């Protein structure tokens, strides 16, 4: 992940402005796809010319290819905000590091094991480790596991641990209203996606989890001496009971299907804690950046959800990462995790196309990257479309047009 001192950053902004202006002028003066397309204009098939026509002079980057062979490119090297295509990169980084059946545990722990009479002397701590899907049902399962472990009396309180993740709630490039409107506080111990019953983002999910577990334990006949709370757990605790999340591949699918920002930042902190020692938004971004760097992509990444307007990726780089995924053991798992036409964030789009792709939307920025099926010859082909600087709804119409052209008309170039 790149960082700049102020003089260097100012110089870079000036240089980028000049480069952008040159790109815009060049785009008007000559066919933009000529910069990256593997097929010369004179021999381009009709489907490629149709894509170029659909784009027009708008600032849209397109990269299409299969198995390491680039078929079509249009400004594929230009950096743009990937929006929620960042979650696609996070998904790749997670699947590269962990096995798809990995689970994330949530423990109930205390300073000592319960005695022969089932007494826990002191507090019972709920220890979260980054499962974004804890809710009342899962807390109920934890309560029964505590009972089955022989606990009958808790002399202290049930307390939700506020560690081990750092409680940061900001990334460079976020708008000031994002924490209130788009991303709840990402914590290690979550509860109901860290919102209250009205959907308002809260700052004490650990307390709500502790209250819920206290109520469930009492319902199960376990006495609890004091009211629930939240705080930083002491060291040296002994696990008494635990629950585990669904497999990682299921967590990724739930995140990508509806493009859940909260899930992305929690899983990003989980990955960041493993790779950099502390669960922060910045370290989650650094972990994704490490993955993309290792595969030759010089992206700029500040979060895991893609909310940051300062993030930069390019269509050609995403295409190459999709090629890498195709050759990885986890490639089919990633493809299956992405929305199909008419499902998730594609619920009103591309119902007539066989597609698996990740969407992305910010104000004046849009993205769609993944796999589309070739109806003429069969087989999946990878693609990435990024746009910026104009209305995202217009951009999505262009995306859909391009995908349909590829699906129904494209064949491998000669």
Identify the residue ranges that each predicted region occupies:
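Beta-lactamase-like hydrolase cores
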Residues: 22-25, 32-81, 100-101, 105, ...
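A small/polar active-site loop signature that marks catalytic segments
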Residues: 195-333
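Short, well-structured active-site flanking segments
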Residues: 96-112, 221-230, 331-335
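A conserved catalytic-loop motif detector
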Residues: 125, 141-144, 161-212, 218-220, ...
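Small-residue-rich helix-loop
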Residues: 71-73, 272-414
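Active-site-adjacent, His/Asp/Glu-enriched structural segments that form or flank metal-binding
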Residues: 104-165, 179-180, 190-191
């Amino acid at each position: 992940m790149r960082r700049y001192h102020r003089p260097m950053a100012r110089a870079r902004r000036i240089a980028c402005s000049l480069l952008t202006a040159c790109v815009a002028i060049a785009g008007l003066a000559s066919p933009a796809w000529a910069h990256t397309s593997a097929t010369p204009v004179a021999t381009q098939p009709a489907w490629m010319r149709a894509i170029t026509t659909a784009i027009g002079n708008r600032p849209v980057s397109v990269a299409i290819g299969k198995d390491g062979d680039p078929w079509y490119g249009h400004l594929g090297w230009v950096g743009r905000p990937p929006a929620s295509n960042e979650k696609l990169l996070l998904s790749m980084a997670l699947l590269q590091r962990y096995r798809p059946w990995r689970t994330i545990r949530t423990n109930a722990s205390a300073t000592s094991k319960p005695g022969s009479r089932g007494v826990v002397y002191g507090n019972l701590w709920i220890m979260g480790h980054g499962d974004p899907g804890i809710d009342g049902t899962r807390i109920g399962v934890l309560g029964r596991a505590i009972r089955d472990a022989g606990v009958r009396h808790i002399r202290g309180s049930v307390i939700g641990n506020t560690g081990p993740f750092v409680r940061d709630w900001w990334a460079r490039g976020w708008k000031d209203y994002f924490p209130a409107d788009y991303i709840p506080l990402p914590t290690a111990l979550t509860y109901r996606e860290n919102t209250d019953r009205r959907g308002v983002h809260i700052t004490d999910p650990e307390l709500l989890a502790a209250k819920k577990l206290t109520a469930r334990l009492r319902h199960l006949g376990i006495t609890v001496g004091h009211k629930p709370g939240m705080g930083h757990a002491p060291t040296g605790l002994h696990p008494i009971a635990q629950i585990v999340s669904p497999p990682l591949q299921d967590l990724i699918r739930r995140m990508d299907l509806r493009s859940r920002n909260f899930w992305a930042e929690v899983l990003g902190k989980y990955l960041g804690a493993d790779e950099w020692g502390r669960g922060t938004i910045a370290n989650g971004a650094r972990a994704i950046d490490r993955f993309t760097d290792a595969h030759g992509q010089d992206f700029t990444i500040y979060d895991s959800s893609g909310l940051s307007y300062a993030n930069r990726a390019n269509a050609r780089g995403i295409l190459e990462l999709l090629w890498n995924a195709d050759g990885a053991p986890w490639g089919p798992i990633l493809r299956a995790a992405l929305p199909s036409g008419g499902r998730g964030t594609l619920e009103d789009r591309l119902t007539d196309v066989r597609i698996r792709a990740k969407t992305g939307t910010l104000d004046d920025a849009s993205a769609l990257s993944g796999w589309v099926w070739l109806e003429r010859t069969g087989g999946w082909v990878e693609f990435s479309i990024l746009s910026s600087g104009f209305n995202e709804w217009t951009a999505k119409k262009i995306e859909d047009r391009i995908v349909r052209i590829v699906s129904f008309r494209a064949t491998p170039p000669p």
